[in-house]
Amino acid sequence: TKGTLDWAYPPFILASTAAALGYEVQIFFTFYGLQLLKKKPNLKVSPLGNPGMPMPMGMDKWFPVLGTAIPGMEAMMTMMMKSKMKAKGIASIEELRSLCLEADVKYIACQMTVDLFDFSPQDLIDGIEFGGAAMFLAFAGDSDICLYV
């Protein structure tokens, strides 16, 4: 994930679904993905450089790509996305994250990245483990399914 709202959903959707189907699930969070483990994530939609993002009101047809770089566009797009998700009954990232933990999905925060970005364990939610890529790969190497999102 890129640590943005729109990129935060796939790992949690896949993990919660896999756990519900009885799979043992682990998610390794590194670099900007660590944003998803913050107690108070401030995730935003990033319309710039996201060509697959459907734009509201047909904006993709009449609003140039550079227009998404206008100050305030990211905040506006984030507000619109959150509003639409709420109207459609889609769980928030915080809700999905909690559901995964309740379903025994194991979260591993990359210790190297935690150190690199000067995160404190107090910045992150409870119930996570800290480890390196080798810790995750020991699990992934024996898995029938391993996805990189």
Residue ranges and their predicted role:
Residues 25-31, 108-111:
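Short internal beta-strands
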Residues 74-135:
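A charged, amphipathic interaction segment
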Residues 1-8, 37-40, 84-88:
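Short, glycine-rich nucleotide/cofactor-binding loops
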Residues 19-20, 101, 140-141:
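Anion (oxyanion) recognition and catalysis
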Residues 34-47:
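N-terminal beta-loop-helix "entrance" segment that forms/cooperates
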Residues 45-85, 89:
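A glycine-rich helix N-cap at a beta->alpha junction
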Residues 138-148:
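Gly/Ser-rich helix-loop-strand patches that form or flank binding pockets
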Residues 8-22, 27:
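Histidine-anchored nucleotide/phosphate-binding helix
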